[in-house]
A protein has these predicted regions:
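Glycine-/small-residue-enriched capping loops at alpha/beta junctions
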Residues: 1-170
């Protein structure tokens, strides 16, 4: 999953800017990413989701760009962006989020958004069950905090809350 922003101070010639934490995806995709996103109507507005096929050395079959709006969104903005990205990936087995998650608060927000967004209630769907795409089963958050013990505790806590939330929603 890929994230971008529409901040005019850092926008590219294509009118959008790649969020700093997603530069690795941009590099792997190639120089055409911003142009392709713009062609598809991506503006970087908060909550906007744009799916684009893979290119370059990107291993994932699809890149999902989610607008942040501002260059430095608050945790709630990250939570919503992660949820939007994971919901847009419905039907896929797994997703990797390249979202800003450089602090424990950001990591918590991204993880909550992803795990809360991965919920889908389909128990009573009979006619529409075949048309319903199952939620993502596995989420990875790409972060420099991956080996931090406190960050691991944050993720464990969020997993517990998400599991409980899914149970209550059912």
């Amino acid at each position: 999953v890929y994230l971008y922003t529409s901040n005019p101070d850092i926008a590219t010639g294509d009118g959008i800017a790649i969020a700093p934490d997603s530069k690795a995806v941009s590099t792997a995709y190639g120089r055409t990413l911003a142009r392709a996103l713009t062609t598809l109507g991506a503006t970087g507005d908060a909550g906007q989701v744009t799916r684009i096929p893979k290119a370059g050395s990107v291993a994932a079959p699809v890149v999902i760009a989610v607008g942040l709006g501002d260059a430095a969104p608050p945790p709630e903005g990250l939570r919503r962006a992660a949820g939007n990205a994971v919901r847009a990936a419905a039907g896929m087995e797994s997703v990797t989020l390249a979202l800003p998650a450089t602090s424990e608060d950001e990591l918590r927000a991204v993880t909550e958004g992803a795990l809360f967004g991965a919920y889908a209630f389909a128990t009573y769907r009979k006619k529409s069950a075949k048309a319903h795409k199952p939620p993502v089963k596995a989420v990875t958050v790409a972060t420099a905090l991956a080996k931090d013990k406190d960050a691991a505790a944050v993720v464990t806590s969020v997993k517990t809350v998400a599991k409980s939330l899914h149970l209550v929603r059912d």
